[in-house]
Amino acid sequence: MENLEFIEEVLEQEHKYSEILPVSDESVYETYEFCDEQCLEDCTISAVQEFYEADLHRIPPYEEASVEQRAQYLTEFHDNFSMQTGYANNLHFVNDMNPRDYGAFNPYTKRIDINANLLKDDDTQEIMNTIMHESRHAYQHFAVEHPELVSVDMETIRIWEDNFNHYIRPEFDYEEYQNQPVEADANDFAERMYNEGLCNVA
């Protein structure tokens, strides 16, 4: 699928969902400063660690919190590393998403939409991994659009750009969808950041 078609498909869904929290008055912020990949990893690992350490003292803790409180906790988690992806203030929890869809990054609006149903699960791993996965897609797109502002090598950026231009949708071939470069990279990023952050929890 060509990138334009992919963007059009995303835009068709843009107004379909209702927010679980009021939309921030602030628009998505895009940085034009250098976004180092190692710094992104370090900040994300620290964000995972700090999320779990904070929950030891938080009132109420995540398991006892309302859906709205959980969304706020996870927004703060995302805020701790999102600027390193190239964007900030772009996380939204939305209702009415297809139950099979956990989240999505919109390359046109730069929004990250997360399925609000994930907030009902007391276990945070799935929703945190989804936030990190979609944040990695944000970084991939930022790298393609601003190669001079990232530490990613040009060959990798070329591969990502080509993949976005010929993106494989999961409904067409799920195995190929999972194995394509941008999805394999986002899955690896989310898994590594979560595991390393969890290992650092005091």
Where would I find each of the regions flagged by the language model?
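Active-site scaffold of zinc-dependent metalloenzymes
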Residues: 94-125, 138-141
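Acidic-residue sensor for enzyme active/binding pockets
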Residues: 14, 30, 134, 140, ...
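Short coil/turn segments at secondary-structure junctions
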Residues: 61, 65, 118, 122, ...
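Metalloprotease/metallohydrolase-associated module, dominated by Zn2+-dependent proteases
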Residues: 87-89, 148-202
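Hydrophobic (often cysteine-bearing) scaffold residues that line and stabilize catalytic clefts
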Residues: 66-74, 124, 128, 178, ...
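Auxiliary, metal-adjacent structural segments of Zn-dependent hydrolase domains
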Residues: 2, 7-110
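Catalytic Zn2+-binding segment of zinc metalloproteases
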Residues: 134-152
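A conserved beta-strand element that flanks and buttresses the S-adenosyl-L-methionine
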Residues: 131
